[in-house]
């Protein structure tokens, strides 16, 4: 995850026709700070609901959103300007 980005793609996409619910367990490391959490995303054609439950050592300056285009839901991120990029490690669970 690059520093100081707005709505940049994480590379994670979901076909709205076949995937309805997703849980993403993740870890973010940015500089000397770390964050561990779970994203829960409910997907419906052109709509979604997202929650982000996490703990972090200090503010990592990362937030998530979902966008829709052509039947695909895309997980995106925004980062603040801390001067450091962040690593994003994740495990995806599809719940249909």
Predicted regions located by residue number:
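Intrinsic-disorder/low-complexity regions
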Residues: 3, 51-52, 89
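Low-complexity intrinsically disordered segments
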Residues: 55-96
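Surface-exposed ligand/attachment interfaces on beta-rich extracellular proteins
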Residues: 1-21, 30-33, 58-60, 80-84
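Subunit-assembly interface segments of extracellular/virion macromolecular structures
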Residues: 15-43, 47, 87, 94-96
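Terminal beta-strand-rich extracellular "head" domains
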Residues: 40-61
């Amino acid at each position: 995850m690059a520093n100081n980005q707005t709505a940049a793609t994480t590379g994670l996409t979901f076909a709205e026709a076949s995937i309805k619910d997703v849980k993403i367990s993740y870890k973010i490391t940015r500089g000397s700070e770390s964050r561990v959490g779970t994203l829960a995303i409910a997907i419906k054609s052109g709509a979604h609901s997202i929650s982000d439950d996490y703990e972090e050592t200090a503010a990592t300056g990362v937030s998530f959103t979902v966008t829709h285009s052509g039947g695909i839901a895309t997980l995106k991120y925004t980062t603040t300007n801390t001067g450091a990029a962040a690593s994003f490690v994740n495990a995806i669970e599809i719940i249909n």
